Amino acid sequence: MADPIRVAVTGAAGQIAYSLLVRLASGQLFGKDRKVELKLLEIPQAMGPLEGVMMELQDCAFPTLAKVEAFDNPEQAFDGINWCLMVGSRPRGPGMERSDLIKINGPIFVNQGKALNRAAQDVRAVVVGNPCNTNCMIAAHNSDVPHERFSAMMRLDQNRAKYLLASKAGAQVIDVTNVVIWGNHSNNQVPDFEFAKIGGKPVPEVIADAAWLENAFMPTVQNRGAAVIKARGASSAASAANAALDHVRSLITPTPAGDTFCAAVMANGAYGVDAGLIAGMPLTSTGHGDWSIVEGVPMSPFIKGKFDAVLDELRREREMVKDLLPG
């Protein structure tokens, strides 16, 4: 059997991690024939609850779980890891603006970016903790790990969009392909129904209802997180954990011919995105943890206008944290 895959998970005592860790430990991501070692990171005051999470993982007696350890120091947690799932971030409190959240979380991702220098040479970092695009940018700019090893999660938005399109068309989710969420994981994201396909046909041909696509589908995807909070009194956890697994799976599995997946990556000029910004893009992978941007996706003036607006939002976020970006 191959060596175990070493995976660090930050925010490991939180709700997303609670849904994520059991599936990760049970072999649902890397397979039943590959053992995993989990290195769980939390803040010192959460080490008690994290001990309980560790006990539960141990009590599952998964054959695929080789080891589980708890840390409150990122350098120790990231030592020798192959994957880093950066789930932890300070949540938005009452009366907090997004700008407040960005400034509070920035220093956390500076430290974690530097700590990633202790990881294995093939490490990949996936940022889930919000605001994930800008947190990912901060971590990448503060690490010696190549920038193409970093990505931020847009997969929950992609999955939400796929479900809504399939439901409206009376199709199966598996029939929906090429869903792109352009830009930022915020309520200004751009769920692109024009490039998406259902059963191999462009969505506007299958769902010939422009008013629904523009005025119902897009806002529903953009505001789904808030709707979940309103309904259950807590933010998305199980669906976010599932999306994180889907995100990694798309990086370790060759992309099916003719399809794409979506994640936020350092675009460096593609589609006019400023160098250094982390933006949602259409991607493919060879299945070796890599990604390539799919160039040449057409944008109507409607989609392009919204994309330009969300790029401005990402630029404003970068300006807020410019003192945390070396060079």
From Swiss-Prot:
Catalysed reactions listed for this entry: (S)-malate + NAD(+) = oxaloacetate + NADH + H(+)
Protein name (Swiss-Prot/TrEMBL): Malate dehydrogenase
Domain of life: Bacteria
Originating organism: Magnetococcus marinus (strain ATCC BAA-1437 / JCM 17883 / MC-1)
InterPro entries: L-lactate/malate_DH, Lactate/malate_DH_C, Lactate/malate_DH_N, Lactate_DH/Glyco_Ohase_4_C, Malate_DH_type2, NAD(P)-bd_dom_sf
Pfam assignment, any one: Ldh_1_C
GO biological process, one term: tricarboxylic acid cycle
Role summary: Catalyzes the reversible oxidation of malate to oxaloacetate.
EC number from the UniProt entry: 1.1.1.37
Catalytic machinery residues: H185 (proton acceptor)
Record CDD domains: MDH_chloroplast-like
Family: Belongs to the LDH/MDH superfamily. MDH type 2 family.
